[in-house]
């Protein structure tokens, strides 16, 4: 039925794989960050979601649960549906925005226009390799889609068309664009990321790689877990944190991953490291760098052995392994060339050498290869991307032709003038076609401004004043975006805007959000016999207890040394508890009824969110901007918890351990990415410049235009690559190559930020740091200074003073602290509380 309604298909469609409780989208972290559905699977996902909505309409479920008070179990019984399906649909109905209209802030202006002659000419190219250099807002995606439509009109079999992108989101959007006019063709062609395509090759030719048909893919946290037992045996000197090897292992795995981006294996890594050692001579610094690289080579060799033994793959293998296979096997090459006659690549500036080598192996002389990109928007150096691949296109594919799109459909002419002026001095511009864009919209908006406040706090006040003024002029909050280079500054801005009553769409660090910490604290009570998380649980409205009573509970458990969950039955046993505290403990117990060592954490959390704590219902009823953000955060958290790596042990403990490790290694950043349905909320978009790539907004605010704000200082990696590893870095040491890439990437980041706005672009800086010292403006301002307006008066919107409430503690006797304990208090008062006060 879904195929008929959504596609108008009269064909009989039969599927044998139905997943009615699937999430609307995968969690953007771990393995799910890379894996994606193929076109056919993507189509079936849509049908599964259609079927669930058809059978369990969200408005009906909201009525039953919110207004009639039915629990998820009651609703499941009434419909005769599986409980997990009902719970997932209720989570979607209560925590995600109900409005499914187009997002306020993003979307493409150029996509709605008739193709211009340069777009039509580029789309019509046939024959040898072709590179289209497409600046911001020039309609590159429309041109790519038009080329695909042209190939289909020429009679090309859609099954022979391969389209490679650099994100699952881009692949999904491209597939949807094509499916809008030709759903069957969209399902037949292969559209996805380089990593997903590499995995497809591994699956097809697994026997030639000595792998099972479906080898398991592991993420960074699983790789560390795999290596932890091997790590102490390696006799390392420079990377030897045996107390907590995760940090060293993560840094070393980053270096190994970077090597795989260059298709360098462990043996090749060792050769480069040995060459460094041979050249070092008496230079002590050079000798140390070589020794560090040799230690990484040692770990690399052990890692490869473990991956082979356990028949596992990591992300870097998904392109590096297929490259070696295709380059070394004429049979595989011929099979892939026959299967993929037409190859199209989006965002070509983001390819690394492994991706280029894979393309060269598949397309041969480059016939029917068509790529589009912009060297000035190359912002993914950490995964090996380089703007030089745009410059080297004719070298990699001899006889290749290049053209450019020359009309910007997105931005006001004054904004176009600013980013084209900056482009003239960019390193990425040295070997590409000049950026000469005509602004199709002409001059309609205001001159680009640089607003200089006195301090970092005043910068937020200036930002708030500007957003408020524009909103009063009729510009929706959702049409305005704040872009920053770092998440830390975004977090401070989000707090500042919300304190001033300005709705902000920003998740930040998911595991640091209060509502997620509450759920994690409750979850830990399921496995911790001493209930240490009771300190936080006792601050929740339904379970409030004074700290003295919490201490009595913890001391009672410490003395009794009970089994897990024994705390849930002691509310009548603990001496000295206030009546309210006994009642709070008693209210906690039902949440853990039936919980055991095999309980699925998602089942537990979903039950609490919907029924046990009625969080979802409360947030839905409140409905303000803050409640919507809390709901989105909880939905994202539960979506993350749905699918976890396989392993031994108690599922709840494994989940908690993985969360700790993800947070420690900053591998949780993908979880700050909002669900697609959140794009409809009318709130100011706060995002990193990386996250804004491919988006556009009516107004863009760009704070932090100060020294070290943008460009940021280069921080050398703890495990720098060996000399000669990075392609195109001849004559540079590994550290110098990383720095050169960093400097170029910072320019590209600023260029991307400047080119996101349609009508208004406002830059912000501050004259003094928080400690009163003067702060110079960013060096990126100078090249565009003549095009900027500098308001003499910068309006500020002051916010309330945010102060914490001190925790009052009564000591039995005078406490004594060591210098180590005092230092811990200065670094982290909360850790001091848990470690030395609540001991």
Describe every region a protein language model picked out:
Residues 104-175, 338, 344-345, 349-538, ...:
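Conserved motor-region signature of P-loop NTPase helicases/translocases
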Residues 1-107:
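Active-site hotspot residues in diverse enzymes, especially metal/ion-binding acidic/histidine motifs
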Residues 128, 133, 500, 575, ...:
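C-terminal, charged and often intrinsically disordered regions of DNA end-processing helicases
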Residues 156-160, 181-188, 205-219, 231-245, ...:
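Short, polar/flexible loop-turn hinges at active-site or ligand-entry regions and domain interfaces
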Residues 1-3, 195, 349, 690:
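Histidine-centered divalent metal-coordination motifs
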Residues 2, 6-10, 144, 202, ...:
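Active-site-flanking alpha-helical
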